[in-house]
Amino acid sequence: MDYELLKRLDPEVFEAIANETRRQTETLELIASENFTSTAVMEACGSVMTNKYAEGYPGKRYYGGCEFVDVAENLARDRAKKLFGCEYVNVQPHSGSSANMAVLFAVLKPGDSIMGLDLSHGGHLTHGSKVNFSGQFFDAHSYGVDKETGIIDMNAVEEMALKVKPKLIITGASAYSQGFDFKAFREIADKVGAFLMADIAHPAGLVAAGLSANPVPHCHFVTTTTHKTLRGPRGGMIMMGKDFENPMGITVNTKNGPRVKMMSEVIDAEVMPGIQGGPLMHIIAGKAVAFGEALQPEFKAYAQQIKDNAAAMAAKFLAADYHIVSGGTKNHLMLLDLRNKNVNGKVAENLLHDAGITVNKNMVPFDDKSPFVTSGIRVGTPAMTTRGMKVAEAEKIVEFIDRVISAANDDNVADVCKQVRAEVRELCLQFPLNGYGLQV
């Protein structure tokens, strides 16, 4: 992208962007929630649609002059419906957290009980964490993974649900490398009269490609981000497989008298005006472009390579005596418990950063360290796969990581990081972004 005007008018901001461009170009991005969008997506996000207010929904705006942003939003909605096989889509949430907030506020009252995967077991802040709105407005209960297997214990989930009688059960995770049995979760939800929501922010691209279980047929609500494995701009989305009359009895007055609102109407109203005002139309345009890209055959090949690369990395880590929580991966990420390597997550993250490899420290189940230190790191393959890297490179990256971790307590660790960084840069330059992300 051409930044000549920015360089001349605001050299300080330009310098920050140039340095970030260099970082993305010359280092390895292994944070599981990050990816590189296409240049086409960035062009849409940087378009004149950033200038337009469009409160409301296509055909029902509170402002005039929305005929062309309506086209973009309808394209995003229609393409998302085709991608995920759903009847209802709202593409206006600014983030995955906003999408989750809208659903929770739509179907719950303050103090209602919810269930979600424990944050320290791989869940997400918005699934009931006490430091988040979801754990402050609602009576949150957390299910977890089995201490031995690292896999969600469905019997324990059912036992908790029967005891707690939640109004909403949330599936989904931010650091769980296995899949979710949505059918089993729905059976539990039906037993206790709960809504079921799947947050597929992480595997959404794999779901869209048909390479991970689709929750749409089983869940009342499905939320996601639009970046991560879906490779779009940063944003959120809400879906329903089938629309239905809201069971809370919320009505709307019509010329024929009151009628029960459809759930889609309740969700739409909770997004806007409930928690948001004007949607980000430039980002929604970017979402439309990304969804169009995800509908192409090449995207399925990309998603398969994400999984292949992750599986290869997991096998290589296990062979090098690393402990992967749950024993392996069925998606795009893995959570490494580093306690047997005598290094904590914070130290590992910092050393790998010095070596040109970006990961994030992450708590592991039953962790005895604080969230600011942690016992593990999370590693993901979406961004490296976007660069065109395959299994051979995935295995080489594990070797890079192992060299750094193995030297963590040695006097020469700085020299090791410096050498690895040079090799990482050389590898990255062999796989330029090629139209994905910023160009230097």
Curated annotation (Swiss-Prot):
PROSITE patterns, A to Z: SHMT (PS00096)
Keyword entries, A-Z: Amino-acid biosynthesis, Cytoplasm, One-carbon metabolism, Pyridoxal phosphate, Transferase
Cofactor or coenzyme needed: pyridoxal 5'-phosphate
GO CC annotations, alphabetized: cytosol
Site (Plays an important role in substrate specificity): 227
Signal peptide positions (record): none
Subunit text: Homodimer.
Function: Catalyzes the reversible interconversion of serine and glycine with tetrahydrofolate (THF) serving as the one-carbon carrier. This reaction serves as the major source of one-carbon groups required for the biosynthesis of purines, thymidylate, methionine, and other important biomolecules. Also exhibits THF-independent aldolase activity toward beta-hydroxyamino acids, producing glycine and aldehydes, via a retro-aldol mechanism.
Full protein name: Serine hydroxymethyltransferase
Taxonomic source organism: Chlorobaculum parvum (strain DSM 263 / NCIMB 8327) (Chlorobium vibrioforme subsp. thiosulfatophilum)
Gene: glyA
